[in-house]
């Protein structure tokens, strides 16, 4: 299963995914969590059953991975009575590094493009209705100039 980058900070001994729930060990306990992101809204629900603790975070900023910082901080405070870790700082630094790497990769990709070349077809040539026997029809429309 593909896990969230925050696993680099929690360093679980085991991790799994089942029926919509990410699961891993956190501070010696099983943590189940589920995330959602749609239409500019995000959420995370985390449960440590053995500590009788659950955390729900809802926000109106898509891809705001601060939700992980809030969940782990709340778990530390309520399940383990521990306020020693600055989750906000750690997760901010982790994701800032990803944004920097993404910008560098884009710059490298543009620099490596073969000069004087272009796509085989114009962007508008991809417009149309496509059909798949299992998935049905999809309309592709160009929104670029």
Roles of regions detected by a PLM:
Residues 1-145:
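Catalytic loop of the DD-peptidase/beta-lactamase superfamily, centered on the K-T-G motif
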């Amino acid at each position: 299963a593909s896990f969230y980058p925050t696993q680099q900070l929690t360093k679980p001994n085991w991790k799994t995914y089942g029926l919509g729930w990410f699961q891993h060990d956190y501070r010696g306990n099983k943590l189940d969590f589920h995330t959602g992101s749609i239409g500019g809204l995000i959420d995370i629900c985390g449960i440590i059953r053995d500590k009788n603790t659950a955390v729900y975070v809802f926000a109106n900023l898509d891809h705001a991975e601060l939700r992980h910082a809030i969940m782990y901080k709340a778990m530390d405070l309520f399940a383990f009575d521990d306020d020693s870790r600055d989750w906000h700082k750690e997760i901010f630094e982790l994701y800032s590094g990803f944004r920097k790497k993404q910008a560098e990769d884009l710059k490298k990709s543009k620099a490596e493009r073969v000069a004087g070349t272009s796509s085989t077809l114009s962007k508008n040539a991809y417009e149309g209705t496509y059909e798949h026997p299992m998935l049905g029809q999809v309309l592709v429309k160009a929104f670029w100039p």
